């Protein structure tokens, strides 16, 4: 049995995500089966946002198979950097909280987020100086991020760089993409390179030249090539055809770029690669 004592007000889903990566895999299933208890009382099937108060006791059971599933792996670590490879369905905050608990006073610094429904690489700093340098590098686009996506049809050219404009729709928790500038919209630039085509889908490398909320998924859908399995911006018929309810998107590679006077200069040019691929479509991990 997993048991947690709440120390500050939160809702059930966010609390579970931030405390137990394993439960992130199975939260919906546990909730539907009413296997989560708060202070000994079973939570209703629709109670993911149940408010928790300090002192509340949350408990649930995971099977041995569920316990053994890997929420994330550490793929690289030195005195300054830590790189993890997380599974889809795992909240990024849960990865951070787990690392922080394991390392105690040594700790880690949260640098960037990765959506719960996206698999792949996350990088953490292990001290304040390197955290500041990494945050600067991400902000100034000195960190090169490459994604792998399964998309509808994809592009005829070997590689294409596309420009559009993205505006947030806070009321609907989504974004809108258009081909022309508009009030409140920001310019986005995304590169797409098909590496494998199979019928009406293709596996593509995707390069973020700007980094905005939902940029890859929304931009791809705007161009008529939605990401397979995307339930927000995707093609419902295509998702149903392939039986996909989770987006086929992986944060595949991270390449670091630092100048000679940087505390991370030794890592300049270093590339990290996720173990995940789309083997079912012939795109193996590289």
Located regions from the model:
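Pseudouridine synthases involved in rRNA/tRNA modification
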Residues: 1-30, 182, 215-286
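Short beta-strand segments
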Residues: 164, 188-190, 202, 214, ...
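Non-catalytic RNA-recognition surface used by pseudouridine synthases
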Residues: 161, 169-171, 180-195
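Short Pro/Gly-enriched beta-strand edge/turn motifs at strand-loop
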Residues: 172-174, 187, 233-238
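RNA pseudouridine synthases
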Residues: 1-172, 197, 281
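Short histidine-centered loop motifs in beta-beta connectors
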Residues: 199, 204-207
């Amino acid at each position: 049995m997993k048991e947690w004592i709440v120390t500050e007000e939160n809702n059930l889903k966010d609390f579970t995500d931030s405390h137990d990566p394993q439960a992130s895999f199975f939260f919906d299933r546990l909730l539907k089966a009413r296997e989560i208890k708060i202070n000994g009382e079973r939570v209703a099937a629709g109670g993911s946002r149940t408010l928790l108060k300090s002192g509340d006791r949350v408990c649930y059971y995971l099977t041995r198979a569920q316990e053994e599933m890997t929420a994330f792996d550490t793929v690289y670590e030195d005195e300054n950097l830590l790189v993890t490879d997380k599974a889809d369905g795992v909240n990024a905050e849960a990865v951070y909280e787990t690392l922080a608990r394991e390392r105690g006073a040594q700790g880690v610094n949260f640098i960037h987020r990765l959506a719960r429904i996206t698999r792949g690489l996350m990088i953490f700093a292990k001290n304040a100086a390197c955290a500041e340098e990494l945050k600067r590098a991400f902000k100034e686009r000195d960190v090169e991020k490459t994604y792998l996506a399964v998309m509808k049809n994809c592009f005829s050219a070997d590689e294409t760089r596309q420009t559009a404009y993205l505006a947030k729709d806070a009321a609907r928790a989504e974004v809108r993409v258009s081909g022309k500038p508009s009030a409140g919209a920001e310019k986005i630039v995304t590169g797409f390179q098909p590496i494998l085509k199979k019928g009406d889908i293709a596996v593509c490398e995707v390069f973020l030249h700007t980094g905005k909320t939902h940029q890859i998924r929304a931009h791809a859908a705007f161009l008529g090539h939605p990401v397979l399995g995307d339930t927000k911006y995707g093609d419902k018929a295509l998702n149903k055809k392939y039986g996909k309810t989770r987006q086929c998107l992986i944060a595949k590679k991270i390449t670091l770029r630092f100048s000679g006077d940087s505390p991370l200069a030794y890592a300049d040019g270093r590339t990290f690669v996720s173990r995940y691929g789309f083997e079912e479509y012939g795109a193996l991990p590289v």
